[in-house]
């Protein structure tokens, strides 16, 4: 099979090395005489893998000891509910930054539990820019500030971390593990797995211990961070294969040199693609340069009537899943950790040829 580069926004491309390892181990995990999908989550082999999974993530991200790491289900969407359930703690207000599709969904769910103060809003500029933090309208009575560091659909990414005197909550689904992060600045970090962590079915939550133990009354027991922490994220049967896939991705990340090395790789990949877009009158990106995403790169063709032909030719050249989200249009290249520089080079070369042949 020839090399195919998958630019899907999620579920996304996995490292080839990880896929091959998963293939090799599919029928028998370790000496269990069974697939990892078939063994109990209480099996000593699985428990050992789960413990290493957490330790590898702690090592990669430098997670302090006074933070719990939870491996949950329900996607980031479940966290839109779990965050207010766990963090309101007697307060009736929370601050949310509205910078795109996913932060809007978090806001909608947050309103079910409290009064939401939208402290900054990028909808007026169609999610192409972010206001400087000095202009934000933070309600000091809010229980927390929630923001989305990288908006997958618009390709809009913060280049700063908001500094507030309240717990900071971040939906890092599409940026986690792409660079180093100072976890101590956050009260809660959460991320669904199907972009930079592994496969769908797993959501990672990193929560500071002093924010646990005071949930809203009459809520599902599974939505209590303390319940999950006290049961090692196994109050119910976990998504075992998703845990396993993440364990293999974490090992791969360590082999690449960790997150400082990945940051350099990701910066180079993004620069290669943005340089090609910026140097062309045929392609464009609407996002303010300062806030362009490393992970998700939308680009528009000057002649929209060529969109379908572009996608058809791209697939023929083994460049797949480049269609942009319907709210933005055009194309979108999602270039998470697993996308190698060679994939970016192939895309850029194709874009140049396509431009030459269609102008």
UniProtKB/Swiss-Prot annotation:
The modification N6-(pyridoxal phosphate)lysine is found at residue 195. Pfam families: Aminotran_5. One of its GO terms (biological process) is pyridoxine biosynthetic process. Binds 1 pyridoxal phosphate per subunit. One of its GO terms (molecular function) is O-phospho-L-serine:2-oxoglutarate aminotransferase activity. Pyridoxal 5'-phosphate binds at residues 76-77, 102, 152, 171, 194, 236-237. Its cofactor is pyridoxal 5'-phosphate. Keywords: Amino-acid biosynthesis, Aminotransferase, Cytoplasm, Pyridoxal phosphate, Pyridoxine biosynthesis, Serine biosynthesis, Transferase. SUPFAM superfamilies: PLP-dependent transferases. Disulfide bonds: none annotated. One of its GO terms (cellular component) is cytoplasm. Pathway: Amino-acid biosynthesis; L-serine biosynthesis; L-serine from 3-phospho-D-glycerate: step 2/3; Cofactor biosynthesis; pyridoxine 5'-phosphate biosynthesis; pyridoxine 5'-phosphate from D-erythrose 4-phosphate: step 3/5. It catalyses: O-phospho-L-serine + 2-oxoglutarate = 3-phosphooxypyruvate + L-glutamate; 4-(phosphooxy)-L-threonine + 2-oxoglutarate = (R)-3-hydroxy-2-oxo-4-phosphooxybutanoate + L-glutamate. Its EC number is 2.6.1.52. It comes from the Bacteria. InterPro entries: Aminotrans_V_dom, Aminotrans_V_PyrdxlP_BS, Pser_aminoTfrase, PyrdxlP-dep_Trfase, PyrdxlP-dep_Trfase_major, PyrdxlP-dep_Trfase_small. The keyword Transferase applies. It is found in: Cytoplasm. PROSITE patterns: AA_TRANSFER_CLASS_5 (PS00595). L-glutamate binds at residue 42. Gene3D superfamilies: Aspartate Aminotransferase, domain 1 (3.90.1150.10), Type I PLP-dependent aspartate aminotransferase-like (Major domain) (3.40.640.10). Homodimer. Catalyzes the reversible conversion of 3-phosphohydroxypyruvate to phosphoserine and of 3-hydroxy-2-oxo-4-phosphonooxybutanoate to phosphohydroxythreonine. Belongs to the class-V pyridoxal-phosphate-dependent aminotransferase family. SerC subfamily. This is Phosphoserine aminotransferase. It comes from Ruthia magnifica subsp. Calyptogena magnifica. The gene is serC.
């Amino acid at each position: 099979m020839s090399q195919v580069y998958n630019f899907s926004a999620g579920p996304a491309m996995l490292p080839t090395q990880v896929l091959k390892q998963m293939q090799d181990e599919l029928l028998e995990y370790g000496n269990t005489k069974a697939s990892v999908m078939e063994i109990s989550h209480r099996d000593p082999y699985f428990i050992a893998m789960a413990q290493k999974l957490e330790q590898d993530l702690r090592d990669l991200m430098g997670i302090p000891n006074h933070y719990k790491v939870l491996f949950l289900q329900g996607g980031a969407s479940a966290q839109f509910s779990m965050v207010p359930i766990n963090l309101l703690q007697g307060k009736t207000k929370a601050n949310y930054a509205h910078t795109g599709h996913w932060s809007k969904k978090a806001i909608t769910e947050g309103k079910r539990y409290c009064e939401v103060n939208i402290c900054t809003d990028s909808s007026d500029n169609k999610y192409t820019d972010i206001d400087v933090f000095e202009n934000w309208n933070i309600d000091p009575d809010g229980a927390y500030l929630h923001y989305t560091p990288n908006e997958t659909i618009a390709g809009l990414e913060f280049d700063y971390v908001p500094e507030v005197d309240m717990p900071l909550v971040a939906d890092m689904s599409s940026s986690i593990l792409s660079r180093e992060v100072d976890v101590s600045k956050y009260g809660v970090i959460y991320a669904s797995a199907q972009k930079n962590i592994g496969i769908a079915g797993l959501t990672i939550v990193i929560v500071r211990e002093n924010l646990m133990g005071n949930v809203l009354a009459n809520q599902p027991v599974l939505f209590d961070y303390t319940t999950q922490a006290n049961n090692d994220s196994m109050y119910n049967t976990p998504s075992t294969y998703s845990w396993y896939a993440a364990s293999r991705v974490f090992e791969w990340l360590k082999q690449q040199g960790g997150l400082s090395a990945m940051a350099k790789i990701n910066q180079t990949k993004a620069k290669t693609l943005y340089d090609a877009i910026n140097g062309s009158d045929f392609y464009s990106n609407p996002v303010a340069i300062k806030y362009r995403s490393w992970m998700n790169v939308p680009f528009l063709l000057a002649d929209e009537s060529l969109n379908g032909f572009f996608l058809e030719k791209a697939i023929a050249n083994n460049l797949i899943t480049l269609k942009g989200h319907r709210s933005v249009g055009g194309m979108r290249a999602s270039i998470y950790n697993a996308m190698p520089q060679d994939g970016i080079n192939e895309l850029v070369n194709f874009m140049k040829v396509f431009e030459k042949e269609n102008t």
